Amino acid sequence: MTDFLDTDYTQRFIFDDSDTRGELVSLERSYAEVLAKHPYPEPVAQLLGELMAAASLLVGTLKFDGLLILQARSEGPIPLLMIECSSEREIRGLARYHAEQIPADATLGDLMPNGVLALTVDPIAGQRYQGIVDLDGETLSDCFTNYFVMSQQVGTRFKLCADGRRARGLLLQQLPADRLKDEEERAASWQHITALGNTLTADELLSLDNETVLHRLYHEEQVRLFDVQKLRFHCSCSRERSGNALVSLGLEDAQALVAEQGGQVEIDCQFCNQRYLFDAADIAQLFAGAGVETPSDTRH
């Protein structure tokens, strides 16, 4: 059984009599960490949770060491949703929004009109890859399904949901022909599995554990469930990185910036709200190549 003391995890499963794999994700602590950093309205928090669930599912399908970045951009009330999830299963996220333009019952199309979804794989070694698809589905689940059908040409279905407390997701994906060689049999099996998956409601996914979800959907199928893979919230910001950003300006511009800001420049992390302060002595130390000691003025 799944140990719900571990509230943030993905869990793979496969169908023994079909060329289909699946994965489930549950996020509570990391989702709460992201929402605690900013006072997001409910519709924004919901979409951000769904995007976190999608990133967690996707990072498990990619064989790489590095960072997966999901960005949804639009011209509407939510200009940006952004999630970063590493191959180490560390996740963070943020949103930009215009609170006065967000009604409680808004749809994805209302909140992110003329939107695009960008999926970027940034490996430690190798070339960066990006795929882009329009946000033209009724839900983020539809948009991710469309992305895989169009760009990867792989049978894929997503079910994503979030309620401000918990984010959950279900991924179903076809595998290369192995158990079923006949194309008609493969198509019929895929249609059967996805039709059953489509009966799962958001309330069920948010409230039931993985074993119960799979029994509810596929009690007549041979399903094998693997061990959970844990996830956690982690922000990769640091004083060193902030200092490097100042170094990239050049000495004169960095000194001028400190002077303009009254003797102390402030760099805030947009993801976690960590604040890093640098004065003239810090700037001198940075450009002397000695690094910056961590003072008492690093704040949340």
From Swiss-Prot:
User: This chain belongs to which protein, by name?
Assistant: 33 kDa chaperonin
* Principal localisation: cytoplasm
HAMAP family annotated for this entry? HslO (MF_00117)
Q: Which keywords does the record carry?
A: Chaperone, Cytoplasm, Disulfide bond, Redox-active center, Zinc
Q: Which family does it belong to?
A: Belongs to the HSP33 family.
What is this protein for, i.e. what is its function?
A: Redox regulated molecular chaperone. Protects both thermally unfolding and oxidatively damaged proteins from irreversible aggregation. Plays an important role in the bacterial defense system toward oxidative stress.
Could you state one GO biological process linked to this protein? protein refolding
For this chain, the Swiss-Prot or TrEMBL PTM comment says: Under oxidizing conditions two disulfide bonds are formed involving the reactive cysteines. Under reducing conditions zinc is bound to the reactive cysteines and the protein is inactive.
For the keyword Repressor, the answer is no
Q: Which Pfam families match?
A: HSP33
List, alphabetically, the InterPro entries matched.
Heat_shock_Hsp33, Heat_shock_Hsp33_C, Heat_shock_Hsp33_N, Hsp33_helix_hairpin_bin_dom_sf
GO cellular component entries: cytoplasm
Q: Which organism is it from?
A: Pseudomonas fluorescens (strain Pf0-1)
This protein's superkingdom? Bacteria
Q: Which Gene3D superfamilies match?
A: helix hairpin bin, Hsp33 domain, HSP33 redox switch-like
- What terms describe the molecular function in GO for this protein? protein folding chaperone; unfolded protein binding
- Name of the coding gene: hslO
Can you say where in the cell this protein is located? Cytoplasm
Q: Does the entry annotate any disulfide bonds, and if so which pairs?
A: 235-237, 269-272
Q: Which NCBIfam families match?
A: PRK00114.1 (NF001033)
